[in-house]
């Protein structure tokens, strides 16, 4: 399902970039960060509702879509053909740095996994209330991404010379 969400996120990002925002990447990133932000806020208060699965699919689509938009196409746009490698390296480096920071954050705030003799998860990890820090940790980062993506709202890739 995550693979499908990723494919849909990439197609959605590319479609709205090309057809709605005239190939500008900033507005697409802003829309996707906005989806992440709204999703995290809604998830914080409704994490026990049955529609949370669909919300997670939409949020996964936004996360993977913005990653593809920023590390793929935007790096080519802003790095140019001669510097695209360094642009991708810098952007992806920050992606993995952010992933590492969030992994340590989640390890500190989320419940540890405990298994019974049959290998079934038991203990604090089974209580949905103990998972509230997960969307709460996403809110400030999605807001930061939204704010920063609005800074490049009007940036457009340079056309090729004929």
Where are these regions (language model features)?
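Hydrophobic/aromatic and small-residue hotspots that mark the transmembrane alpha-helices
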Residues: 9-18, 106
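C-terminal ends and interior cores of transmembrane alpha-helices
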Residues: 34-48
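Intracellular juxtamembrane helix-capping segments at the cytosolic ends
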Residues: 65-80
